[in-house]
């Protein structure tokens, strides 16, 4: 093979391999001119893509890393629209391209939160991003080779647009990667010089990247002319000589492989590659279902791993759908069962209404009833009759709840629809009563910090300003000058509580509703707060302390004091996922409620959680409406 010839010509050491892979002097000059042309082709583009980021990396961290290179116009960490979790990549925009070039040279593959980042020019044209020209595929890579090592190896052949090692869910290398060159000539040069060479003592394959659609089309053609045969149930006593004798009688072979374990013992299966397709078909027909040393053999076309997994997945889905269709309308769900009810008693209670095929009470690991179970009838008519007769009937002193059983995904979908309808109705009522902002202005996802005294434009804005997932600076400020913190009407630049506040503090709210101050709680004749309503089960400690503080504070500080107590509770909610920016926005929305209502729920965990969920739903609906527009 050509790979072996190239491998023999290549030295074994890593240093020598790298030297062997480097282009000639004339090629180096060509590469230099390509780099120059690349920079010219970038035009005025000063936007960088930053990938391989830890989910906890924020705009603030990236700003502090990139701003020393040159004035940064904006930083945006891309997040999921619903969960607000980082997608692992971001965009950094500089004022001029020279700063972007320097950042690419100095910061590419530098560690951010102990993970090397991957930086390349942001390519807004999807046609250029998806083009296959200049894209090469490298496999059989040593696990120790990372993105930087791959980039260093292949950068000698031309300007690289992107370079990536494929990894699993744990971040470990999968042994292959991709390098996208600016020109097809650079890609061809890399293939000629590196294909079949040793990298970290492993011979690598380098070839043009073939899109998956083209690979699948080619694969379908290969399936109709296969020559590789898989044979199993050979037993563990078979020898290589016996296996070769078994398969060679059908025709000439290219290779024969009997699988063995670490100890060299056969594992019971093997592969045979025949030279002709017709011979492979003949071997399958001749070996399938035949006896060999007491075992019935199986022979068939050798399949790729992903192909076998896909077939198993399809078989599982078909079996699952068959079961679901079989039990549709005949399986009942029963809950509120007494602990004394077991399978036999459950069957006896429901037996008068039809023929029962199965009855099961669900139990925990200790064998104790979970209080619910299932009964399956032979026909939908019997199941419907049982629901009519047994629903709300007293059994062992407890009324039963009996309905047709539903799949978990159907049940979840119906529940989400019910919650959404309920939240929409509640939000409409609150908007009509002024409980929550009825109108959102400005562009969500962009936050403009400005000079001291800056106010976000628009009325009806959210108390924390628009979604501060994108940080922007005023046009061309002095280099290394950060925007001020604690901007009225919004969070500080990074979406966290402003400096000067205690841990868990909350920033003061700026003017809203067209410049009018936010509504307060229950002011007295001189604007003093009358205090929170008393609860029947005793005053809550948090609400009581807030009430005392409000009585001694000016009216304009009421929202601030309540926010300082409310913000840490919102931040601790599971749905917020520790996102300080998101917690700030939701807290600001809750502060649009009357203070009296806030104090009523601030110590009620379920009540506060319901209000938070309503606010999250309202915010997500707003984002979706903006996308539709």
From Swiss-Prot:
* GO terms under biological process: mRNA processing; mRNA transport; nuclear-transcribed mRNA poly(A) tail shortening; regulation of translation
**Which regions are flagged for Basic and acidic residues bias?**
26-42
Q: Does the keyword Nucleus apply?
A: yes
Keywords for this entry?
A: Cytoplasm, mRNA processing, mRNA transport, Nucleus, Repeat, RNA-binding, Translation regulation, Transport
Q: Where in the cell is it found?
A: Cytoplasm; Nucleus
The record ties this protein, via Gene3D superfamilies, to: 3.30.70.330, c-terminal domain of poly(a) binding protein
In this chain the RRM domain maps to 46-124, 134-211, 227-304, 330-407
Chain intervals with Low complexity compositional bias = 493-506, 514-531
What GO molecular function annotation could you give as one example from this UniProt entry?
A: poly(U) RNA binding
CDD domains for the chain: RRM1_I_PABPs, RRM2_I_PABPs, RRM4_I_PABPs
| Region feature Disordered, mapped onto this chain | 1-47, 465-543
Question: What does UniProt give as GO cellular component?
Answer: cytoplasmic stress granule; cytosol; nucleus; post-mRNA release spliceosomal complex; ribonucleoprotein complex
Q: Which InterPro entries match?
A: Nucleotide-bd_a/b_plait_sf (IPR012677), PABP-dom (IPR036053), PABP_1234 (IPR006515), PABP_HYD_C (IPR002004), PABP_RRM1 (IPR034364), RBD_domain_sf (IPR035979), RRM2_I_PABPs (IPR045305), RRM_dom (IPR000504)
Every PABC domain range: 542-624
Q: Does the keyword Transport apply?
A: yes
Q: What does this protein do?
A: Binds the poly(A) tail of mRNA. Appears to be an important mediator of the multiple roles of the poly(A) tail in mRNA biogenesis, stability and translation. In the nucleus, involved in both mRNA cleavage and polyadenylation. Is also required for efficient mRNA export to the cytoplasm. Acts in concert with a poly(A)-specific nuclease (PAN) to affect poly(A) tail shortening, which may occur concomitantly with either nucleocytoplasmic mRNA transport or translational initiation.
- Please give the family membership noted in the entry: Belongs to the polyadenylate-binding protein type-1 family.
UniProt protein name: Polyadenylate-binding protein, cytoplasmic and nuclear
Q: Which organism is it from?
A: Yarrowia lipolytica (strain CLIB 122 / E 150) (Yeast)
């Amino acid at each position: 093979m050509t790979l072996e010839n190239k491998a023999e010509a290549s030295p074994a050491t890593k240093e020598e391999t790298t030297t062997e892979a480097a282009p000639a002097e004339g090629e180096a000059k060509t590469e230099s001119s390509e780099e120059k042309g690349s920079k010219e082709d970038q035009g005025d583009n000063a936007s960088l893509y930053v990938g391989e980021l830890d989910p906890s990396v924020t705009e603030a961290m990236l700003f502090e890393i990139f701003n020393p290179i040159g004035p940064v116009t904006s930083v945006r960490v891309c997040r999921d629209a619903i969960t607000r979790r980082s997608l692992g990549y971001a965009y950094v925009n500089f004022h001029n391209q020279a700063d972007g070039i320097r950042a690419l040279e100095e910061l590419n593959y530098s560690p951010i939160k102990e993970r090397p980042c991957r930086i390349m020019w942001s390519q807004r044209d999807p046609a250029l991003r998806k083009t296959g020209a200049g894209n090469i595929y490298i496999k059989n890579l040593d696990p120790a080779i990372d993105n930087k090592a791959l980039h260093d190896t292949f950068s000698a052949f031309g300007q690289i647009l992107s370079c990536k090692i494929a990894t699993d869910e744990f971040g470990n290398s999968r042994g292959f990667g991709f390098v996208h060159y600016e020109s097809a000539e650079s890609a061809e040069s890399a293939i000629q010089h590196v294909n079949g060479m040793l990298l970290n003592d492993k011979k690598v394959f380098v070839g043009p990247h073939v899109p998956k659609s083209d690979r699948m089309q080619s694969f379908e053609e290969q399936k109709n002319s296969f020559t590789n045969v898989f044979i199993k149930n050979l037993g563990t006593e078979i020898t290589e000589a016996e296996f070769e004798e078994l398969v060679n009688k059908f025709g000439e072979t290219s290779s024969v492989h009997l699988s063995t374990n670490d100890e060299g013992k056969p594992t019971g299966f093997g592969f045979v590659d025949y030279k002709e397709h017709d011979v492979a078909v003949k071997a399958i027909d001749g070996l399938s279902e035949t006896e060999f040393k007491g075992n019935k053999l199986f022979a068939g076309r050798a399949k790729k791993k992903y192909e076998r997994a896909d077939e198993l997945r399809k078989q599982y889905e078909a079996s699952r759908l068959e079961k679901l269709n079989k039990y549709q309308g005949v399986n009942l769900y029963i809950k509120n069962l007494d602990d004394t009810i077991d399978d036999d008693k459950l069957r006896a209670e429901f037996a008068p209404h039809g023929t029962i095929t199965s009855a099961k009470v669900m139990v925990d690991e200790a064998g104790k009833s979970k209080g619910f179970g299932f009964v399956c009838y032979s026909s939908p008519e019997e199941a419907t009759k049982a629901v009519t007769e047994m629903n709300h009937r007293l059994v062992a002193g407890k009324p039963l709840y009996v309905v047709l059983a539903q799949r978990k995904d159907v049940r979840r979908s119906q529940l989400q629809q019910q919650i959404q309808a309920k939240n929409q109705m509640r939000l409409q009522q609150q908007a009509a009563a002024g409980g929550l902002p009825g109108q959102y202005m400005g562009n969500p996802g962009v936050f403009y910090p400005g000079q001291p005294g800056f106010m976000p434009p628009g009325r009806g804005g959210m108390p924390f300003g628009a979604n501060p997932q994108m940080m922007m600076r005023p046009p061309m400020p002095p280099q290394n000058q950060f925007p001020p913190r604690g901007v009225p009407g919004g969070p500080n630049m990074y979406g966290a509580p402003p400096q000067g506040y205690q841990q868990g503090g909350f920033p003061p709210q700026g003017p809203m509703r067209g410049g009018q101050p936010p509504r307060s709680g229950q002011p007295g004749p001189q604007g003093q707060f009358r205090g929170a309503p008393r609860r029947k089960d005793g005053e809550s400690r948090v609400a009581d302390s807030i009430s005392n503080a409000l009585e001694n504070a000016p009216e304009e500080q009421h929202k601030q004091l309540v926010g300082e107590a409310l913000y840490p509770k919102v931040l601790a909610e599971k749905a917020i996922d520790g996102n300080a920016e998101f917690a700030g926005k939701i807290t600001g929305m809750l502060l649009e409620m009357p203070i009296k209502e806030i104090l009523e729920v601030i110590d009620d965990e379920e009540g506060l959680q319901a209000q938070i969920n309503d606010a999250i739903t309202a915010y997500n609906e707003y984002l979706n409406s903006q996308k539709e527009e």
